[in-house]
A protein has these predicted regions:
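A conserved structural/catalytic subdomain of Rossmann-like adenosyl-cofactor enzymes
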Residues: 17, 32-293
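S-adenosyl-L-methionine
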Residues: 2-33
Length: 293
């Protein structure tokens, strides 16, 4: 942890070692210390996590009303600890395995508490599998935001499981994958097969199951080919239009890359050689402005 802080130029970070669940170190007298922001990547599915902590927790993280995380899976113990450690205007992001989205019994009760009763969950981002060392299971990022909870009408979900590149035995998020997630999250707009705002009423009808494929359908794996383009050349306008999220961010880039085909309506001509596309993008004014943000 100290090495991580040094690498991020945080030389005076306060680091405490201990059992977060059973013996919290950050406290104000007999209650948990609260923070404006929390980022966490707790160990996945910790077993036998309940030791000195009580079922009726003295820090009010869980109880019979909220729900008590099962002893064989400590994921919600960490998430509820984070919720309790946030100020009323606080925001948190926590990486957890996908199982927290759909496992039943006590965990379903906790999801109902977080989604419907308190409305703390602002969003869920589904990540590709095999990103983390030591496990190949897919993870998700759960975003907690307390400040606007009272007026929250639903949960914004992003399905980013297909955005990655192979890097040896593991998968890795590329810069464009991260940028796409960030752009769509900031815009909070629906994108077919990728992002969607799901109402609390719809989640309730699904018994508070938050499994992303229930709400965002996967794209057809069949790649449709334009035979006319193969036979006579040109880039189908439909294919270029599908990249609208990039043209929205960099509106001038489209005209720098493409022009209308000289003889065929509905098709474009690439204005540069294929190997020069990356250079054109890198030098585009709108792209450079986005990179500086």
């Amino acid at each position: 942890a100290k090495m991580n802080m040094i690498l991020h130029n945080e030389l005076y970070a306060e680091i405490k070692q201990g059992d977060t669940i059973n013996d919290p170190q950050f406290k104000d007298e007999d209650q948990l210390k609260t923070f404006d922001y929390i980022v966490a990547n707790p160990p996945f599915s910790t077993k036998s996590w309940l030791k000195s902590a009580k079922i009726e927790d003295i820090y009010h993280r869980w109880n019979s009303t909220i729900g008590i995380p099962p002893d064989k899976n400590g994921d919600y113990a960490f998430l509820l600890h984070i919720v309790r450690s946030l100020k009323q205007t606080g925001c948190a992001a926590c990486i957890l395995p996908h199982g927290v989205l759909f496992r039943g019994n006590a965990e379903a009760q906790i999801r109902k508490f977080l989604v419907a009763e308190k409305r703390y969950i602002k969003g869920i981002i589904g990540l590709p599998s095999n990103l983390f060392f030591g496990t190949g299971i897919p993870a998700c990022i759960i975003i907690i935001e307390k400040s606007e909870a009272a007026s929250r009408k639903g949960v914004f979900m992003i399905d980013a499981k297909n955005g990655y590149t192979k890097d040896g035995p593991k998968n890795r998020l590329r810069e464009q994958d991260i940028r796409r997630i960030v752009d769509v999250w900031q815009a909070q707009r629906d994108v077919t097969h990728f992002a969607r705002f799901v109402s609390i009423e719809e989640i309730e009808k699904n018994d508070y199951n938050l499994n992303i494929p229930r709400y965002i359908s996967s794209p057809d794996t069949e790649i449709l080919q334009d035979i006319e383009a193969h036979l006579h050349g040109g880039l189908p306008q439909h294919d270029v239009d599908q990249l609208s999220m990039y043209w929205d961010v960099c509106p001038s880039l489209r005209n720098e890359l493409f022009c209308n085909h000289s003889t065929r309506n509905g098709y474009y001509t690439l204005l540069c050689e294929q190997e020069q596309v990356c250079e054109v993008v890198a030098n585009n004014t709108d792209f450079c402005q986005q990179s500086d943000i």
